[in-house]
Amino acid sequence: DLEKTKNSFDLAKEFAKKLGKDKKIILFVGTKKEAKDLTERAAKELKMPFVKERWIGGTLTNFKQIKGRIDHLNDLKKKRETGELDKYTKKERLQIERKIEKMEIYFGGLAENLKFLPSAVLVVDSKHEKITVKEANQTKIPVVALLNSDCDPSGVNYPVPGNDNSRTSISYFLSEFAKSYKEGIILAEQESATADKPAKEQPLVINH
């Protein structure tokens, strides 16, 4: 039903616009092969955190521990950049380098932009990402999802029916969502500029 799909997508885009206006963080999740690079690209475009490899259980429900892993990764990368790792032996440096590489696979997409729990989670294929959806539900985080029409939309606040196996469909879903988020940012800037503008002086009227 095209009309139903359009209405669902309009609701999701309106939500994206509101998130953009309020400068909220969205966690993008797309771990199936058709979605990995597209998910990463859309998230990076908005400077948002993303997961494109295996979802690490507890990313939302045990965020404090996950945040500790992210901080550790960022600390190691910083030490590598500043040359602090030079004091270690060649063998030790190699071990640390391997550790960074391994952590990058699972936490690299979260390292820069996930300082606290996100305000929304966007998933490509809610059936494939059912653990993510479950964790989002447990932590009361709204879920936006592209899902096949035969998928169970329960647990998804903004379901968008579509072909979640088609790269064209996934790309369109992600780019439209990102576009709406950007529209929200522009809207906030316009409202801010209007609020900052001094009120136009009214002519002085003297009643005789």
Predicted feature residues:
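Intrinsically disordered, low-complexity mixed-charge segments
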Residues: 184-208
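Ribosome large-subunit tunnel/peptidyl-transferase-proximal elements
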Residues: 1-163, 167-193
